[in-house]
Amino acid sequence: MRVAQNILLVALCCQATTALVTPTRQHAIASPSVMTPRTRLSSDAVGEVSRGGDQQGGGTATIPNEVFNLIKSIVGAGVLSLPAGVAAFGNAPSAVAPAVLLIAAMGAISAYTFGLIGRVCRKTNTMSYSDAWDVSVGKSSSFIIAFSCFIDCWFGNLSYSMILADTMVNLLSSVGIAATRTQSLLGVTGIVLLPLCLMKNLASLAPFSLVGIVGMLYTMFAMAMRYFGGSYAAGGKFLAGALAAPAFGSNGAKAALSAKSLILTCMLSNAYIAHFNAPKFLAELKNNTMSRFYQVIAWSFGAAVLIYAAMTSLGFLTFGAASNGLILNNYSTNDLLMSMSRIAVAISVTGSYPLLFAGTRDGILDLFKVAQEKRDNSLFNKLTVGVLAATTLAAAKLTDLGLVASVGGATFGTALVFIYPTVMFLKTQKGKSTFETKLCKVIAALGVVMGAIGTKLALQDI
């Protein structure tokens, strides 16, 4: 953990090596209950974004509170597709080594750009991702953020529906109930998801985020038990009931040099996304100096790196090239330990689904600029049913979670992590040429290239 934290602190603090701290106004980011006026940057106000810890203010959340909540925001069911990302380029155990390095590198870049958003919000005196974009880049392009928010949330709902479809059919099978994947999906959607998504107040669902991180940690423990216990190796207790026999070959660490490793990169772009919440975490942090904010980021993304590295390694080392897009599908339905993981994941995804769906629905309304006074219950209900039906139909047709994760990451994941934060930061620099502005240009360019190539590779096998 200490090594991961130090790596991320270096990534975050490299921004402090290029120039001196520029003081900014006290309480540039206010408590979430206080609206800060959105003002266009004047020509003399746009400059270097504050890097230091001169400011104090913010909310009441301590660093440990923020770290725990940010870890919950980052780590989700998407980690269950990462072993398939390794299998996309390698089939030998040594492929895990470059995969772990890639996980760490993507974590560091994601942490850095998460911090950039906080810095831009502080400089532009804004409290949200979209407001920061409007002030730094311009309102004329605000539809880009609205569309990206909608698509990002919708891809999340699509992935969750696919996870529930696979998880429920396996859970039903484990208790002797025969049902198809589509039947399971329609059942859980109509009986559980639709009523939850129609709820007007989602506050009661907040505790499910805790279930999510506990479920992921339990799943990691269960995967470790099965790998080190050899239950799915040759002659293993549960091998006969596995989705497919483990498959290993000779494509190891060197295979990471192939373009197919970008599929894992794109999945990781999606896996680390919590960037829309960066302004909220900065605003709610007690004594919210940038140095304290960086500590929150370093510990949180460091923990996410360790969890992702462990679960990716355990899944791939157990099943190799046979790793499914949802790694839980590989395990036998007769394996009680993994059935408990499926239950934990199903509860977590079910509780989180309407929270994410609210972002999808609001994103559509924002994209089409529907006035608040027109957002009545009738429109709310019709839109909910329509969007949920479309999502369910797509989830019924699509069966490869890894494909959805890689395409979503290649398109909007790379944009949200690599491109948008760096563009906002560069706009506040007004043409300055420093090490950091050059670094941001490189990161943005990498996002474009990786997104284009990653999308092509992910789709070519369809």
Give the role of each language-model region.
Residues 85-126, 164:
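Extracellular loop-to-transmembrane helix junctions
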Residues 63-81, 190, 269-274, 311, ...:
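The first (N-terminal) embedded transmembrane alpha-helix
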Residues 29-85, 89, 110-111, 115:
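Membrane-interface "cap" regions at the ends of multi-pass membrane proteins
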Residues 43-59, 64, 115, 120-146, ...:
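Membrane-interfacial loop- and helix-cap regions that link adjacent transmembrane helices
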Residues 82-97, 202-203, 403, 460:
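Short, hydrophobic transmembrane alpha-helix segments
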Residues 77, 107-116, 189-198, 420-421:
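Central hydrophobic cores of alpha-helical transmembrane segments in multi-pass inner-membrane proteins
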Residues 63-71, 75, 97, 101, ...:
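Residue-level signal for short hydrophobic patches within transmembrane helices
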Residues 1-29:
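N-terminal chloroplast transit peptides
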